[in-house]
Each structure stands twice: as structure tokens, then as C-alpha cells.
Amino acid sequence: MDGTTAPVTKSGAAKLVKRNFLEALKSNDFGKLKAILIQRQIDVDTVFEVEDENMVLASYKQGYWLPSYKLKSSWATGLHLSVLFGHVECLLVLLDHNATINCRPNGKTPLHVACEMANVDCVKILCDRGAKLNCYSLSGHTALHFCTTPSSILCAKQLVWRGANVNMKTNNQDEETPLHTAAHFGLSELVAFYVEHGAIVDSVNAHMETPLAIAAYWALRFKEQEYSTEHHLVCRMLLDYKAEVNARDDDFKSPLHKAAWNCDHVLMHMMLEAGAEANLMDINGCAAIQYVLKVTSVRPAAQPEICYQLLLNHGAARIYPPQFHKVIQACHSCPKAIEVVVNAYEHIRWNTKWRRAIPDDDLEKYWDFYHSLFTVCCNSPRTLMHLSRCAIRRTLHNRCHRAIPLLSLPLSLKKYLLLEPEGIIY
């Protein structure tokens, strides 16, 4: 037995070839890869199990549950791995040996992976070799739906130029078009490109949401509590493309409701100027002003006083007076917002609920304001100047924002009529 080696079994030899094949793919050793395929030591469509913690290679049906350890690896062919690593030479070798170009061992074709990796060279090669442009992944997405980053815009353009359907909806419970996806991720260049190539601006998903509504909702980065200028630009573009500003989803929410939920005064101004109706109600009977009221306390980056001012100047119905304590509950740390709302009434009288709604530290911090609030909101009528303001605003109603700036009045009076906060009530 000494000096001899154990014979290599057939299964052992197959494992060795498979390992060499995988190493050649990873190192982009296309010469070695070609030699293995010429010798027919392994099938060109051999499936490997590889690490894939970010699920670039995998795609699963919505609603399916898998344990976490199952999601850390995926099945993939040599084509998928070549695209994943960006190894164009290996990709060409495999295609020259008739690799199955639309294979989906773990739910995605190589073209899906190429778009997710934003590798435009691989996209071009796969398209040239006959990859199906509108093929669904197991999760119901086409290649265009995987173009979700600025670096993948060129991939999307290649697909559309070669005939990909810009209005094809996902084959899942969301039913979103590529335009919805571009709006979701704030890709203004891609939004413009899709519309120029026939995308329906007011296409709706399964929840009856338009791309404008999607962009308005995702304009707030919830984790960072920051507003996205990219999404603002997308909304501006969609409105310029004549998107319906008062479109309603299946909960009767308009894009203005979405912007109000984010307390996003930039988008609210944009939509109101484009003709959004300030008093549209959702399925629960809430208008945009109620949405702002609900979220004011949890939007640290917001300027709620501007949101209220915009809505009231565009004819929004005022908060029901007996519920005014809820305004104070939501805005106790933002006196300017309370000032804007309270000045929309000819007169309103305070009650004990108002005082209970103000934390002691905020009462002390903003004492001058709250002292003026309780002094003015008593049994005595407001000043003649305030009552004149209310009369003018009542006459102009939803034209306040447009008509008041045109009046022959000093700027300070125009600001007063438009409910510009001053930090104190008189």
C-alpha cells in the first residue's frame, strides 16, 4: 500500500471538475473555462450553490416563507455567476458553448442579474444573444423592474431601445409598471426616458396608485427623516407630463394625502399649485389637513406651519373648533403651527383641554406665545384687524394664495392676510 494513491472515484472526479469550473468563473480564467467545456468534462448549464446574502441571484414568490439560512445561498449557472462577477469574457465563452440564456435556477435569468448589478456590457451581450426582454422572475418582475439605481439607468435604456415593454406590470400582488419603480426610487432621468418612450403617466398599480402618488409617498426617507429632492424632481416632472394630481387610490387617498402624511410642504405646495383639491377625503373621511395633524409630532424635519398655511390658503376646511385641543397636542412644541391654525378662525374660545395638552416644559419655553394664545382666545372678540382679515379670506376662500399677492397692499399686510406666523397672537 505504501507509495500508492487512492483511486479517484467517478463522483470525486466530477466534484473536482465542478470546483475547477467554479474557480475559473470566479477568477475570470476564460481560457481554462473554455478548455473544460471543449473537453466536455461538465455540462455548460451546471447549477452551483453559492453564497448570496444580498439575494442578487435569487427571487422568490411573494408570501413564501423560508428560514434565514436558506436565504444566504442561491443556485446559479455559470451565466449567472459571470454576470454577477462582471466577467464578460467568461460570459461570451459560455454563450459560445450554447449555455441556456433564460435559465432560472433560483428565480432570475442572467438578464435580471445583469440589471440588478447594473452591468450594461452584460446586458448588451445577453440581448444580442437572444435573452427574453420581458421575461418574469419568480417574484414577478421583468428586467426593467430590476433597474432601481442611477447606475442601472443605462441598462434600462438598452432594454427599451431593444423593445422591452415600458408598460408591463409586475406579475405579483403589486402590479407595478417600470414607471412606478422609477418613481419609487426617485430616478428622474429614467422617468423622463420611460415617458418619452410611451410609458402611461397615470398607470395604476394593484392599489390604484399612480407613479405620482408613489413618488410623493417615498419622498420622505423614513429612517433618516429627510426629504428627497430627487423624488421632488420626479413629482415636478410627472405633473409637467400632465399626471392627474387628484387621482385616488383604493383608499381614496390623493397624492396630496401622501405628501401631507409626510408633512412635506414642498410637495404640498407643488400639488396645490397644480390644482390639487385641499378638501378631498379618504375612505375614513380625512382630508389632507387631518393627515398633517396626525403626523406633526413624528416629523422632526418638517415645517408644519407651512403645511397648514398652504392648505388653509387653498381653501381647506378648518379643524372642528371643539377638537382644537388636538392641534395643540400635535403642535405644542411648534407654536407657529398653532398660530397659523388659530388665526383661521374669527374667534375661538379656549377650554381646559387646551391647557392639559401643553407639557409644562413647553409652556415655560414658549410662555410668551401661550400667554398671548390664552389671552386672545377668551370671551372677548378679536381685534378689528383680525376680523377684517377673516372677512377678506372668507370672500376669497380657495383663491387666497392667488388673489392676496395681487392686492395693492404693503407686503407686511399681505403676509398677515396669508396667515404668516409672527410668534405671538394679538
Curated annotation (Swiss-Prot):
Q: Where is this region: Essential for interaction with HIF1AN?
A: 238-239, 244-246
Q: What is the lineage of its organism?
A: Eukaryota, Metazoa, Chordata, Craniata, Vertebrata
- Free-text comment on this protein's domains from its UniProt entry: The SOCS box domain mediates the interaction with the Elongin BC complex, an adapter module in different E3 ubiquitin-protein ligase complexes.
The species is Homo sapiens
Q: Which residues carry this modification: (3S)-3-hydroxyasparagine?
A: N246
Its BP terms in the Gene Ontology are:
intracellular signal transduction; positive regulation of vasculogenesis; protein autoubiquitination
- CDD domains, per database record: SOCS_ASB4_ASB18
What is the annotated localization of this protein? Cytoplasm
Name it: Ankyrin repeat and SOCS box protein 4
Classification via SMART domains: ANK, SOCS_box
